[in-house]
Amino acid sequence: MANGTELRGIALEILLEITQEKEYSHLAIRNALNKVQYLPKQDRAFINRLVEGTLEYMLRIDYILNQFSSVRVNKMKPVIRNILRSGVYQLMFMDSVPDSAACNEAVKLAQKKGFYS
């Protein structure tokens, strides 16, 4: 079983491919999940749900982020923008993920990507 940061990192890479590289979501998800067949089915399902849910609610999530951030979503670095989007999705729509875990893993992922507070 992979750790939460690894799973969210895979989801982040998929989100970046879709939002930055303009890859079709179903193709990006399928290609990424094919590369991680070694992960348990439950972990791959988590990645899929996180990506699809973040994309489905992206407009709503961006609206929320704009209400609370001093930096507009469209001005954020793509990595940070997508970490925040997936974090907010987990907080709002994934009841199986504790709020503390969603926040902690978002911070860990940002640090792993080279962003420090």
Located regions from the model:
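Class I Rossmann-like S-adenosyl-L-methionine
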Residues: 1-117
